[in-house]
Structures are given as C-alpha cells and as structure tokens.
UniProtKB/Swiss-Prot annotation:
Belongs to the ATPase alpha/beta chains family. This is ATP synthase subunit beta. It is a peripheral membrane protein. SMART domains: AAA. The keyword Cell membrane applies. Its EC number is 7.1.2.2. HAMAP family: ATP_synth_beta_bact.
Length: 458
C-alpha cells in the first residue's frame, strides 16, 4: 500500500505524486481517506506523477493531501446481498438501509467472455407490447436499444418493459441509472417495491449531478453485478438508462485529460469505450444477460457518432419517432425504422414474418401516397390504394397501446397483449376482416377483440 500526495487539482482531475518505485497502474483506485474520496488512475505522466479522475466531488481538495493506493481497480459488492439495494458507483449503499454485508467483491474492469464461452440463442422474449413483439421481437439473452430524442418516451417504454418482463421473469434484474434524473431512480424504486419484486432487483445509480468519472464508471458497476449472477447460472435482465450519458461522461473525461476531440467533439476513443462496455454484455453457456438500453439521440439525428456507434452492438433496435408521438400514438415506435435480427422466418415462424412484412409494406405504401393525397386528395387514388390507405391508418392506430406504467397519467388501464393475439389482430386487418370498423375503434386498445367491442358500443 504505497502513499502519495496531491500535487494539482483542476476540477475533477487530480494529479498525485508517488515514489518512483511505487507508481500505481492505470485504473488503480486511490483513496483520500481524509476527504472520503476515491480517485481512478487514468494516465501515468512520468516522474512518479499519475493523473486521476475523481469519483466524487473534488470541492475542498488541496495540495499536500495524503493519497493511499489500494493496489487494484475499484471493486464492488456482488451476489445475493445486492438485491433490493440502491448503490452508488463504488458499491456503497445510498438507501440508508445499513451495510450491504457482501460476501464477495469483484473489480469493475474485467475481460469480456471469450468467443468459445459465448452462447447464442433464438428463444423469443415476449414483451406484451404489440409493436415491439410484431416488428422488432427481442431475443432472450440479446441486446436491445431504445433510440429516441428528448421527450418521445424512452424511459416510459423502458419502465413498461421492466413492468411486463421483470415482473413475469423468474430471474434477477440489475438497473444501472447512468447520468439520468434522480426523480426517475426514485420512481423506479417505489415502482419495484409496490409490485413486490424489489428483492429481485439490484440498483446502481450515478445521476446527472455526479462528476463525469462517476457517470463513466457506474454502467460498469451495474454490469459487474449482472455478470456475477450470470456466472452463477442465472438469467439476468440488465437495464441501462441512458447509454448516451455514458458516452457523454467519456467525452467530458477525455476533454479533462486534454485529449484532442474527434468528430462532433466526441472523444477519439468513442468506439473502443463503447466496445469495452458492450462486449461484456453477453450470454455465456452458464447463464444469460438480456439487456435493454435507452439511447438518447441528440437533435433526433441517428447518424450522430454516439447512437451510430451503439447501433452496431445491438440485436434489436426500437426507434422512437417524434412524428408518431405528435400524432398522439404511444408507444411512438417507428415500425419502418425499428429492426431485429430475430425477425426471420426460421426464428419467429413464417406466419409472424409474413404479417410483420405485410404491415411494413402497407405502411410504406401509405407513406409514399401521403404526398399525392396532400396535393390531389383521396378521390384521385385507385380503389386499391384507397383500401391500402384505410388499412394503413387502422394499423397505425392499432400500433398504439395503453401502458400499465402510464395509468396514473392517462386514466386508462394498461394492456398486455400476447404474441398470438398480436399476430391474429394484424393479420385480420391486412386480410380486410375489419375494413367495416371505424378507424377510431383501433386507437389505444389491447387485443383485436377490444376493437370489435369498442366499435359495437358506438
């Protein structure tokens, strides 16, 4: 355990000098005992000086303070004791419910599983959300991204997925709140408590008000806890909200360390940093990690380097659209932009594939006809096109669905729709079984039976 002294403090960056023969390694955790602060080594500057990033507030730090090298990277509690608890980036409890009392700790910087240890699966994970189950089905043990700009419903969608999957799921869940609002973390805790599944969830939070070093590492802390459960042979759900804040924290740290920025001001190591996190989120022959990640899209630009780098790592992408949200259709998932590797007849079956394809074809044709309708009106369309437009509008409305987590805001009870009912409903619309029903009957309902019931009431 070597000791050094603080020689320079610039915001969250702290330079520490050690004896030449005891210089800490990169990623080692250093502790300033008097300030109860942990630093992580980022660079060795030479002459025994290392440059570190503070994991907490650096207010009040001064030159000459004693710093102790722990000799290893940041380690966090893992295992059963973390369930039902809220922790920070260092694995310290922040829920005022006493010590974690862990039996084991893991370091947060770990190697990804080797290629031969990884397993692939084609088992589907039903979410109960029509548009997702139909157009971009999730795989058990896969990686899913929820892409969307500000205010189109990423967090609400994620909460609904947690509600539908985590509550019905017999395994364990880990939630990593990366650079998001404290209020959302609070809401999530009480949501889990009310539904009685708190003892199956471990929560790790590093909110918006935390320093960049904290936000950069909190995703790794959550992932380390999920990996432990996976290595014990369990099926784990890993939720991250929000991956963009992880990238942004990396950008801040990179700038603080004086690195030259690359495209759009991002860090030059963007792809590598994303890879370090994403390569570890994988299923092995022992257990599985199914991850759902919210990804903020700056200025609704999907070609921005941050979301574009994330796309490459995912099995399914759920793209939320501002245009669809402005039509009052929630969840505002864009069925033409969202994709899934699982949407293959060999995985989902021929019927599901054909119905999903049919829905996308009709919606795409409607999109093409919109300009003609705007200029010439509906009367100039052929009868076939008029039918297509009518069915497309019904499909658009039917893609909406009341959420359980939004009941308090909307006043309408949430609906869970099984995959079988979803396929049956859309197949019926495509085949013209419901051509005689009014368009409005398809809006904000669960299964197709409710549409018929709603239409008959009118």
């Amino acid at each position: 355990m070597s000791t050094g002294t603080v020689v320079q403090v610039i915001g969250a960056v702290v330079d520490v000098e050690f004896p030449q023969d005891a210089v800490p390694q990169v990623y080692d955790a250093l502790e300033i005992k008097s300030e109860d602060l942990v630093l992580e080594v980022q660079q060795q500057l030479g002459g025994g000086v290392v440059r570190t990033i503070a994991m907490g507030s650096s207010d009040g730090l001064r030159r000459g303070l004693e710093v102790v090298n722990s000799g290893s990277p940041i380690s966090v509690p893992v295992g059963e004791k973390t369930l039902g608890r809220i922790m920070n980036v260092l694995g310290q409890p922040v829920d005022e419910a006493g010590e974690i009392g862990e039996e084991e700790r893991y370091v947060i910087h770990r190697e990804a599983p080797s290629y031969e240890d990884q397993s692939n699966t084609t088992e589907l994970l039903e979410t109960g959300i029509k548009v997702i189950d139909l157009v971009c089905p999730f795989a058990k043990g896969g990686k899913v991204g929820l892409f969307g700009g500000a205010g189109v419903g990423k967090t609400v969608n994620m909460m609904e997925l947690i509600n539908n999957i985590a509550k019905a799921h017999s395994g364990l869940s880990v939630f990593a709140g990366v650079g998001e609002r404290t209020r959302e973390g609070n809401d999530f805790y009480y949501e889990m408590e009310d539904s009685g599944v708190l003892d199956k969830v471990a929560m790790v939070y590093g909110q918006m008000n935390e320093p960049p070093g904290n936000r950069l590492r909190v995703a790794l802390t959550g992932l380390t806890m999920a990996e432990k459960f996976r290595d014990e042979g369990k099926d784990v759900l890993f939720f991250v909200d929000n991956i963009y804040r992880y990238t942004l924290a990396g950008t801040e740290v990179s700038a603080l360390l004086g690195r030259m920025p690359s495209a759009v001001g991002y860090q030059p190591t963007l792809a590598e940093e994303m890879g370090v996190l994403q390569e570890r989120i994988t299923s092995t022959k022992t257990g599985s990690i199914t991850s759902v990640q919210a990804v903020y899209v700056p200025a609704d630009d999907l070609t921005d380097p941050s979301p574009a780098t994330t796309f490459a790592h995912l099995d399914a992408t759920v793209v939320l659209s501002r245009n669809i949200a402005s039509m009052g259709i929630y969840p505002a998932v864009d069925p033409l932009d969202s994709t899934s590797r699982q949407l293959d007849p060999l995985v989902v079956g021929q019927e599901h594939y054909d119905v999903a394809n049919g829905v996308q074809t009709v919606l795409q044709r409607y999109k093409e006809l919109k300009d003609i309708i705007a200029i010439l009106g509906m009367d100039e369309l052929s009868d076939e096109d008029k039918t297509t437009v009518s069915r497309a509008r019904k499909i658009e409305k039917y893609l909406s669905q009341p959420f359980f987590v939004a009941e308090v805001f909307t006043g309408s009870p949430g609906k869970y729709v099984s995959l079988k009912d979803t396929i049956r409903g859309f197949k019926g619309i495509l085949e013209g079984e419901y051509d005689n029903l009014p368009e409005q009957a398809f809006y904000m309902v669960g299964s197709i039976d409710e549409v018929v019931e709603k239409a008959n009431k009118k």
